[in-house]
Amino acid sequence: MTQDPRFPNLFILNHPLIQHKLTHMRDKDTSTRTFRELLREITLLMGYEITRNLPLTTRHIETPMGPMDAPVIAGRKLAVVPVLRAGVGMSDGLLELIPSARVGHIGVYRDEQHRPVEYLVRLPDLEERTFILCDPMVATGHSAVHAVDVMKQRGVPDEHILFLALVAAPEGVEVFQQAHPGVKLYVASLDSHLNEHAYIIPGLGDAGDRLFGTKN
């Protein structure tokens, strides 16, 4: 895991398997089926990385050889909240890693001016729960900011929110960290820049279209 000195709460997950799979996802010749499988696999690996500092407590159990106080994750069950629609493709990998997690959804799309438009919010009980928000791309950053706004407006503190993305542009990370400096953002890659159409360069194209086999 590395950091960029410009962005104190951005964490780049540079594990070799993550980077290898991301390269195949970027390839324009990768099929929809393979893209979908890779997204699940890479999200599982990223989920392993971002949960390494979850707090632990102990629970008394009996092993076949006798009693012990064994480590378990402290607090209430985690929640996975994909940002629709492309974030749905990331939830499978996280739920494979954390099958007991609760699931919410935040529906946001970008209008012609690249502003976020909310159309759905469905969340589990919020109290004392850690939330992993996921969206493959942080381009302009506005959708990510809006998704975190949704959580914080409902009383979820910064330290209980983790935002997970595959690829981000510096412009979007700047917007995100100005809006939510206390929320940690985890990505597989910090790419070069946004083009005139607000697409990440080099990026991987439209993640939703590639995931679902649709045309923009």
Swiss-Prot record:
<feature type="binding site">
    <location>
        <position position="110"/>
    </location>
    <ligand>
        <name>5-phospho-alpha-D-ribose 1-diphosphate</name>
    </ligand>
</feature>
<keyword id="KW-0808">Transferase</keyword>
<feature type="binding site">
    <location>
        <begin position="205"/>
        <end position="207"/>
    </location>
    <ligand>
        <name>uracil</name>
    </ligand>
</feature>
<protein>
    <recommendedName>
        <fullName>Uracil phosphoribosyltransferase</fullName>
        <ecNumber>2.4.2.9</ecNumber>
    </recommendedName>
</protein>
<dbReference type="InterPro" id="IPR050054">
    <property type="entry name" value="UPRTase/APRTase"/>
</dbReference>
<dbReference type="InterPro" id="IPR029057">
    <property type="entry name" value="PRTase-like"/>
</dbReference>
<dbReference type="GO" id="GO:0044206">
    <property type="term" value="P:UMP salvage"/>
</dbReference>
<feature type="binding site">
    <location>
        <position position="85"/>
    </location>
    <ligand>
        <name>5-phospho-alpha-D-ribose 1-diphosphate</name>
    </ligand>
</feature>
<comment type="function">
    <text>Catalyzes the conversion of uracil and 5-phospho-alpha-D-ribose 1-diphosphate (PRPP) to UMP and diphosphate.</text>
</comment>
<feature type="binding site">
    <location>
        <begin position="135"/>
        <end position="143"/>
    </location>
    <ligand>
        <name>5-phospho-alpha-D-ribose 1-diphosphate</name>
    </ligand>
</feature>
<feature type="binding site">
    <location>
        <position position="200"/>
    </location>
    <ligand>
        <name>uracil</name>
    </ligand>
</feature>
<dbReference type="InterPro" id="IPR005765">
    <property type="entry name" value="Ura_phspho_trans"/>
</dbReference>
<dbReference type="InterPro" id="IPR034332">
    <property type="entry name" value="Upp_B"/>
</dbReference>
<dbReference type="InterPro" id="IPR000836">
    <property type="entry name" value="PRibTrfase_dom"/>
</dbReference>
<feature type="binding site">
    <location>
        <position position="206"/>
    </location>
    <ligand>
        <name>5-phospho-alpha-D-ribose 1-diphosphate</name>
    </ligand>
</feature>
<dbReference type="GO" id="GO:0004845">
    <property type="term" value="F:uracil phosphoribosyltransferase activity"/>
</dbReference>
<dbReference type="GO" id="GO:0000287">
    <property type="term" value="F:magnesium ion binding"/>
</dbReference>
<dbReference type="Pfam" id="PF14681">
    <property type="entry name" value="UPRTase"/>
</dbReference>
<keyword id="KW-0021">Allosteric enzyme</keyword>
<comment type="pathway">
    <text>Pyrimidine metabolism; UMP biosynthesis via salvage pathway; UMP from uracil: step 1/1.</text>
</comment>
<keyword id="KW-0460">Magnesium</keyword>
<dbReference type="GO" id="GO:0006223">
    <property type="term" value="P:uracil salvage"/>
</dbReference>
<keyword id="KW-0547">Nucleotide-binding</keyword>
<dbReference type="GO" id="GO:0005525">
    <property type="term" value="F:GTP binding"/>
</dbReference>
<keyword id="KW-0342">GTP-binding</keyword>
<keyword id="KW-0328">Glycosyltransferase</keyword>
<comment type="similarity">
    <text>Belongs to the UPRTase family.</text>
</comment>
